[in-house]
Regions:
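Nucleotide-activated donor-binding/catalytic signature segment of Leloir-type glycosyltransferases, i.e.
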Residues: 255-279
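Membrane-proximal helix-turn-helix segments that form the acceptor-binding/catalytic region
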Residues: 23, 82-89, 104, 108-112, ...
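N-terminal subdomain of nucleotide-sugar transferases
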Residues: 1-45, 91, 157, 235, ...
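Carbohydrate-associated surface elements
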Residues: 164, 184
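Conserved acidic donor-binding segment of nucleotide-sugar-dependent glycosyltransferases
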Residues: 329-340, 348-354
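A short helix/loop element that forms part of the nucleotide-sugar donor recognition site in Leloir-type
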Residues: 191-206
Length: 404
């Protein structure tokens, strides 16, 4: 197939949805499809066979896009429409594949061009409003809910990335055309690590024998970085030799987090690196003893969880749906999103190397059995088989549903 893919993100940047898009593109390439990707003017090009990247025009003074809804995204989405119009006027496509809010454009395009549409559902749009504390407006939430229903019910095929989203699509009445494909490749990219694990500790002033807990990811409120800081302050009292290594965050976010750590007595055990190249994240993982995911809100499974399962390191996470869709107490330590609980669990893991090793081994076994790359590619092929089958049928007109 020749596919027009619409990705309203800074592709490629080392963060959630762009990682997911990267691996989807890799799978489609391996399956023999040709993809024209229309995306934001921000991000770096990646070399994938059968992929061409077309970027929207960059407006003055726009150099980055924060995660979640924003006015900047609205401007860039509008500019993407011009690039999309040029593509469809010059090329003939067999299918439209859209991500996030571009699903609404994808549904309209598919009807106009008479080709099938696949919606890649990475999150719930209404839930984004609360996750990113963007707005509490009931009107805006109803608008996002309406848009999501149009995208799901107006598509011939839907991919969901976690069980909660799959259940939501089923409740909408589109379960028969949706397929759950977990982001099993996580935040991995096809680049060799540039530094040995030992060099990571040296570079960031961490003693070779210090126990290290690692957090990697963004600093958005729902990620629970402040919870981790509070837990680190408690850990510092009993294990001042330990280090909590935090990889990620914009410079201003890192400065604020470091100030909070200083205020709460955690600064001596915390190391903030800021954003690091995606190819170096495996080295940070291997330089650590425990991997922490302290999320406090949301239902989507973090992409990093899947690569953590294969890492050979134990996972400590909050016992919320965002994690428990994949993690169980047999393959991870799950605790309430509370500083003392997180600190106590971290101290217990630090003090018990045998428990760490056993947890990591069981996690790797589950990853090999349930979350293999082969299964990911196979299910992507199934989604496109459904897309082709759905193209011959009539997609029902979306109906109004009660707001969730």
């Amino acid at each position: 197939m020749r596919i027009l893919m619409l990705a309203p993100e800074p592709f490629f940047e080392p963060r959630g949805t762009p990682f997911s898009e990267y691996h989807r593109l890799k799978a489609l390439s391996e399956l023999g499809h040709h993809v024209d990707l229309v995306t934001y003017p921000i991000g770096r090009d990646v070399a994938i066979p059968n992929l061409r990247i077309f970027r929207a025009w960059r407006p003055p003074l726009v150099s980055k896009v924060r995660i979640g809804p924003s006015f900047t995204k609205l401007v860039l989405d509008t500019l993407m429409l011009l690039t999309i119009a040029r593509r469809v006027s010059r090329e003939r496509y067999d299918a439209i594949h859209s991500h996030e809010e571009m699903g609404l454009v994808g549904v309209w395009l598919s009807r106009w061009l008479g080709v099938p549409h696949l919606y890649d559902m990475h999150s719930s749009l209404p839930q984004q409003l609360s996750n990113f504390t963007y707005s509490r407006s009931g009107v805006l939430r109803r608008l996002f809910t309406w848009a999501e229903v149009q995208m799901v019910l107006g598509s011939q095929s839907v991919i969901t990335i976690c069980q909660e989203l799959q259940d939501e699509v089923t409740r909408m009445g589109a379960g028969d055309r949706s397929l759950l494909i977990e982001n099993v490749m996580g935040g991995e990219v096809d680049e060799a690590p540039s530094k040995p694990a030992a060099d990571i500790r040296t570079a960031w002033g961490i003693p070779a024998d210090a126990p290290v807990a690692l957090y990697t990811g963004t600093f958005e409120a729902y990620q629970g970085v402040e919870l981790l800081v509070d837990a680190a302050a408690i850990l510092a009292e009993s294990r001042p030799d330990a280090r909590v290594l935090v990889v990620g965050g914009e410079p201003q976010q890192v400065d604020r987090a470091r100030a909070v750590a200083r205020e709460r007595g955690a600064v001596d055990v915390m190391v903030f690196t800021g954003q690091q190249p995606a190819r170096e994240i495996p080295s940070f993982v291997q330089a650590s003893d425990v991997l922490v995911s302290p999320r406090i809100r949301g239902t989507n499974t973090p992409l990093k969880i899947y690569s953590y399962l294969r890492s050979g390191r134990p996972i400590l996470a909050t016992n919320l749906l965002t994690h428990t869709q994949v993690l169980t107490s047999d393959i991870a330590v799950l605790v309430p999103p509370e500083p003392h609980a997180l600190a106590e669990a971290l101290a217990a893991l630090i003090d018990d190397p045998a428990a760490r090793q056993a947890l990591a081994a069981r996690a790797r076994a589950v990853a090999d059995e349930r979350y293999s790359r082969e299964a990911y590619v196979r299910r992507t092929a199934q989604a496109y088989a459904r897309l082709s089958a759905g193209a011959s049928g009539q997609v029902p007109t979306p109906q109004t549903v009660t707001e969730r």
